[in-house]
Amino acid sequence: ATFTVINKCQYTVWAAAVPAGGGQKLDAGQTWSIXXP
């Protein structure tokens, strides 16, 4: 399965996914796709 994290805030956030790979800095409007087994 693939999960997509979308930062809909107007500021930078730090998203985390454990144990899928730690964290990711997301600027406003940025997305992060995470593949889970």
Swiss-Prot record:
InterPro entries recorded: Osmotin/thaumatin-like_sf (IPR037176), Thaumatin (IPR001938)
GO biological process: defense response to fungus; killing of cells of another organism
Keyword rRNA processing belongs to the record: no
Signal peptide from the UniProt entry: none
Keywords per UniProt: Antimicrobial, Fungicide, Plant defense
Family: Belongs to the thaumatin family.
Biological role stated in the UniProt entry: Has antifungal activity. Inhibits the growth of Trichoderma viridae and Candida albicans.
Tagged with keyword Aminoacyl-tRNA synthetase: no
SUPFAM superfamilies in the cross-refs: Osmotin, thaumatin-like protein
Superkingdom, natural source: Eukaryota
Protein name (database record): Antifungal protein S
